[in-house]
Amino acid sequence: MPTVEELRTQGEIGGRTVQIIASGDVRCTSYEPAPLAEGSVRIATVRSAISPGTEMTFYGSNASNVYLHKRWNEELRLFEEAAPSMQYPITFGYRAAGVVVDPGTTDVPTGLRVYGNWRHTEFTAMPAERALAQALAEDLSWDDGVDIGQMGPICVNAVAFGNGEHRGGIAVVFGAGPVGLVTAQVARADGADVHVIDRIPERLAIAEGLGFSTLLADGSDTAATLKRQMGANGISVAWECSGSTFALHEAIRIVRRQGLVVAVGFYQGESRGLLLGDEFHHNGVRLVCGQIGNLHQSMTWESLRARTIELARNRSVVLGDLPRLTFSVEDAAGAFEALSRPAAVLQTALDFGK
C-alpha cells in the first residue's frame, strides 16, 4: 500500500487531509500539493463522505480491518500471517465530489464539477480524460456526486449479483444503513418487491419514508415471521448489507430452498452466529459475495456509474438526499465519532468550504 508521501508525490492528496493515526484517532493535517503531472488536472474537493462500514474498521483502538493484521498476497490472492499490508497513519476515503481549479496543460475547463472515489483531501489530481468522463451534471447535487463515485456503484453491483432472480418477486434487504437503503432502491427499480429489516427503529423509519415495507429485528424470529406471510418459497433473494454475521445467518434462513443470498457487508473477525449446518446445508442455499472489489461479470465501473446516474436523474433512487450529518473537514474526528451513534446518525459528510 502506498505511503502518505507516495500519495502526495503522486498528486492523490494535498492541502487539508484526513488521517487515522496509530492510536485509532482521527486528525486533519495539511500537505503541500505536488506539481501536476502532464495531462492531469487539479480538483478542489467540495464534499466527501465517510464510509460507515469499511472506514470504521480502521478507526478506534480496536480497529479490526484485516489489512492491519495480515499481509495480502496479490499473486495468490490470499491473506498470510506476515507483516500487515497497511500501517498507520492511514489516509482513506472513496466518496467525493469537487471542482477543477487547475486544468494544467489540458483543455478541461476550470470550474468543471467532478465526482469520484478519491480520499478525504482538499486537492487531488486526476487524468483529464477521467475528469471529463466523471463530470457531474448540473441537475445533481454535490452529495449526489459523492454517492455516484462509489456508493451507488457498490449497490448496483450488489443487485447485479441477484442475476435477475429478484425481478417480479419478493426480496429482502438486511440493514437499513446507507448501503442497504440504496441497495433496496436499486433492487426495487429492477423489479423486486423489497422488504427491509434492521434492528434500529430510526433507520427503519427512513426506509419507510422511501416506501418500503419493514420489519424490526427485535430478537424474535424474523425469518419465520416473513416466511409465514410469504410462504416457504416466497423469497428468492436476500441482500445482507449490515456486515453482521448474525444477520447473514438470518438472510440464509429467510430465502426459499436453493434461494440466493448476496453478502454485501464487510464481515469482521470470526463469524459468530453463522450456523452453516442449519438452513444453509438443509436448504441448499447459494451464498455469493457481492463486494465491489469483485465486479459482476455483466458490469464495468463505467456501466455501474452510468446506471447509478440514470437512477438518480430519474428519481428512482434517492442518493444525496439521504440523511447525512455534515462536519467541516477540520472536525473530521467529530464526524467519525458521530458514526458510533447509529440510531441518531445514518452517515456523515465532510465539507471543505469551497
Describe each region flagged by the PLM:
Residues R47, L112-V114, F123, I170, ...:
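Residue-level marker of beta-strand positions
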Residues A224-R228, A232, G273-P323, G334:
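C-terminal substrate-binding/catalytic core of Rossmann-like NAD(P)-dependent dehydrogenases/reductases
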Residues W142-S220:
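Mid-domain Rossmann-like dinucleotide-binding core that forms the NAD(H)/NADP(H) cofactor-binding site
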